UniProtKB/Swiss-Prot annotation:
Keyword Zinc: no
UniProt-listed GO biological process terms: ATP synthesis coupled electron transport
Similarity field: Belongs to the complex I subunit 2 family.
Reactions catalysed, as given in the entry: a quinone + NADH + 5 H(+)(in) = a quinol + NAD(+) + 4 H(+)(out)
EC number annotated for this UniProt entry: 7.1.1.-
Localization per Swiss-Prot or TrEMBL: Cell inner membrane
TM ranges: 9-29, 38-58, 73-93, 108-128, 161-181, 208-228, 240-260, 277-297, 306-326, 328-348, 374-394, 408-430, 452-472
GO cellular component: plasma membrane
Entry protein name: NADH-quinone oxidoreductase subunit N
Record organism: Paramagnetospirillum magneticum (strain ATCC 700264 / AMB-1)
Main location: membrane
InterPro entries xrefs: NADH-Q_OxRdtase_suN/2, ND/Mrp_TM
Function: NDH-1 shuttles electrons from NADH, via FMN and iron-sulfur (Fe-S) centers, to quinones in the respiratory chain. The immediate electron acceptor for the enzyme in this species is believed to be ubiquinone. Couples the redox reaction to proton translocation (for every two electrons transferred, four hydrogen ions are translocated across the cytoplasmic membrane), and thus conserves the redox energy in a proton gradient.
Amino acid sequence: MIKTLDLVPVLPEIFMAVAGLALLMLGVFRKEDSTKSVSVLVILALGAAMVLVSSLGGERLTAFNGLFVADRFAGFAKGLVLVASAIATAMSLPYLEREKIGRFEYPVLVLFATLGMMMMISANDFIALYLGLELQSLALYVLAAYNRDNARATEAGLKYFVLGSLASGLLLYGISLLYGFAGTTSFEGLANLFAGGHDHPIKPNMGIIAGLVFVLAGLSFKVSAVPFHMWAPDVYEGAPTPVTSFFAVAPKIAALCLLVRVMTGPFADLVEQWRQVVTFIAIGSMFVGSFAAVVQTNIKRLMAYSSIGHVGFVLVGIAAGSTLGIQGVLIYLAIYLFMNVGAFAVILSMRQKGRMVEGIDDLAGLSKTHPMMAFVMAVLMFSMAGVPPLAGFWGKFYVFMAAIESGLYTLSILGVLSSVVSTYYYLRIVKVMYFDEPVEAFDKPVGTSMTLVMAVSTIVILAFTLIPAPLVTSAKAAAQVLFPAAG
């Protein structure tokens, strides 16, 4: 029987589920086109969920016999996901109206995907993890192929669905191996078994290690880490641009936070075993992301490889396996959110004679035709490249310092080298905007929502340098929850 008290930690998720179903009904029963009104209500629902998440406070609460956990780490991660989803929904409205593909299902799917992400972040058992992951994935498959009259979008959705199903299979196989050898799917149960705090502690054998590797492979696909990144460039390029902006931020943050919880929870005592795998994936992601982006001509494909590189940097912090490492990861993800939504606001404003353009060369002479847009893009590109004193530099600084503290010197040096390589393609965009002659100006006006997103993201990136304390302290408090002994 479910106690009323048991439902308190799950209030934000219950609210999101009820809101999603209510808005689905509203969209169906309204006679006229309801995309705009449903989108506004979805943004309000995401805001209300944010209030509910923050009202839970920082104490650790569990629900459904320990399947679900709400703590400071979950609160921080859910905050990032809700902000990313709200911004993505706001940015998509003008695009859907211009392209005449506005349907009320779009914002509702974003809401359900976000609900899945929140469930993933709070999962305290592999069954709950899979439930949240699949709810998110099913909504994202539909969003990828949302523009069904476009062959590229349909192809993107199909590729994502086929490869996503394969990744889910790998993940489930890993979970079944872990259950077979350990006898439990609970994070706390597994942690006790490996830590020796159980009547019959077990040593990590080949079955456990194989299960762990399969789980890592399944989750690596969800964050598009090398070598499970094949889908990302095609899906990012083929999907409608607002969908790409959503894919690049919210699901990635949720999956990386889930990976943090899995690695530091049930497998905290197997750090030496999983660190090798995570280090390999991190190095691959950083270098493949950096070198592949150099040759791209389409800005959405470039952003796909850029995000693969960023995942590599985040994995450096996870490989450190310490409070400092996870603090660095959370700071990096918060900065990554604003860098990406700002860059996608510029990409969504790339219109010539009413149609979207996606070539890097189309940005030529932007400093002369749209000086403010060029300034925003330049700040964001410098930040992504990790140029001090911008926020992007500090994000990398924290994860590399954590890696050095954990003795991962080679990983840190390779990370810095790949960061130097990535500087080339970010600065190439700045060079095209400021030193190339304009071919054709972008359409004006840019739109209120885009201008607002560009302004806020630029202010956040510049302000972090001056006042880093709020983010750094909240990230530290969230990270310490996962390491109670070190806290």
